[in-house]
């Protein structure tokens, strides 16, 4: 698995929020080639937060993209662990190639982080 797969756990549940919230992970999912937004794609999110380590099962959750290919999931504040504060995101549903992303925050005080997927069919 390419970069960002640290502490990845297959099958994280689809949730409305991870923990107490207060921090937003969001982005888009599009198809490679034509850039079409992809609806109903499962995106898994995890990170080291004020409520737990990125290896803790409770720090993992997933969400689905809407009709515009947009996803958004609230989670506890991300905090630095082994360097810059960052999140982990994965597309792992099988219709497209698996992708792992590890976006880095500009500041530990940021309250949101974006990541954008371009998926290639399998």
PLM feature spans:
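Beta-strand-dominated extracellular/periplasmic modules and repeats
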Residues: 1-122
């Amino acid at each position: 698995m390419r970069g960002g797969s640290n502490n990845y756990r297959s099958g994280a549940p689809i949730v409305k929020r991870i923990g107490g919230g207060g921090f937003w992970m969001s982005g888009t999912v599009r198809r490679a080639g034509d850039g079409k937004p992809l609806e109903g794609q499962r995106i898994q999110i995890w990170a080291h937060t004020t409520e737990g380590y990125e290896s803790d099962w409770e720090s993992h959750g997933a969400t689905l993209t809407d009709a515009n290919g947009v996803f958004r999931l609230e989670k506890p504040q991300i905090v630095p662990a082994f360097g810059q504060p960052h999140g982990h995101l994965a597309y792992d549903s099988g219709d497209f190639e698996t992708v792992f992303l590890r976006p880095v925050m500009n500041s530990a005080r940021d309250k949101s982080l974006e990541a954008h997927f371009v998926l290639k069919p399998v």
